């Protein structure tokens, strides 16, 4: 991972590109294949095209991230690929857990996948949380919040993860307003 390479002072240009290739596969190709197999394949070529658009958007997002200088490290420009992949995974998890299927579920999946692709290549601001310092003393309230989130997740993991990932996805347009 790029962050580990920077911490250990082993970063290189090759490593940066290799890391991006791994990210395209993990956060672009894999979720696109998952949502395609989940339901987009039922609509034929449009489903294949939407899955391809998701992969292309992830690749473009990562390429832009590699070449553009950081303006404000507190924000990403566009939805980060791992979060787009997490929204796909959480959405499918909820749909599978609730036995949601059929034409309307596939239509929602198609629209959501396109919206995620657009968010990745957009210039919408998304919090990076890089300004949070967790190396020093962490306030007690922050620890309580972490415990609360884990307890909340334990009640209904699919829905809680879907809510958290969707809230982050929607935060970009809300920060833009």
Predicted features, each with a name:
Residues 1-6, 53-67, 107-126:
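Hydrophobic, membrane-facing alpha-helical anchors
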Residues 2-5, 9, 46, 60, ...:
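Generic preference for well-ordered secondary structure
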Residues 3, 7-65:
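Multi-pass membrane catalytic core of lipid/isoprenoid biosynthesis enzymes
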Residues 7-15, 39-46, 67-73, 98-100, ...:
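Short juxtamembrane and helix-loop transition motifs at transmembrane-helix boundaries
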Residues 47-91:
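Hydrophobic, well-structured mid-protein blocks that either form specific transmembrane helices
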Residues 73-177:
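C-terminal membrane-associated helical module and adjoining short loops/tails
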């Amino acid at each position: 991972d790029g962050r580990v390479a920077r911490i250990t002072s082993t970063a290189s240009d090759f490593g940066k590109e290799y890391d991006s290739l791994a990210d395209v596969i993990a956060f672009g190709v894999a979720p696109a294949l998952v949502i395609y197999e989940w339901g987009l394949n039922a609509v034929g070529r449009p489903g294949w095209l939407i899955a391809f658009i998701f992969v292309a958007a992830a690749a473009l997002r990562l390429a832009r991230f590699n070449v553009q200088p950081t303006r404000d490290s507190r924000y990403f420009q566009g939805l980060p690929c791992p979060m787009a992949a997490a929204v796909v995974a959480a959405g499918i998890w909820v749909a599978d857990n609730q036995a949601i299927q059929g034409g309307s579920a596939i239509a929602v999946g198609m629209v959501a996948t396109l919206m995620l692709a657009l968010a990745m290549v957009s210039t919408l601001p998304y919090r990076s949380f890089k300004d949070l310092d967790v190396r020093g003393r962490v306030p007690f309230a922050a620890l309580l919040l972490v415990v609360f989130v884990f307890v909340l997740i334990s009640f209904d993991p699919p829905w809680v993860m879907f809510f958290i990932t969707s809230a982050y996805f929607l935060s970009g347009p809300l920060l833009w307003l």
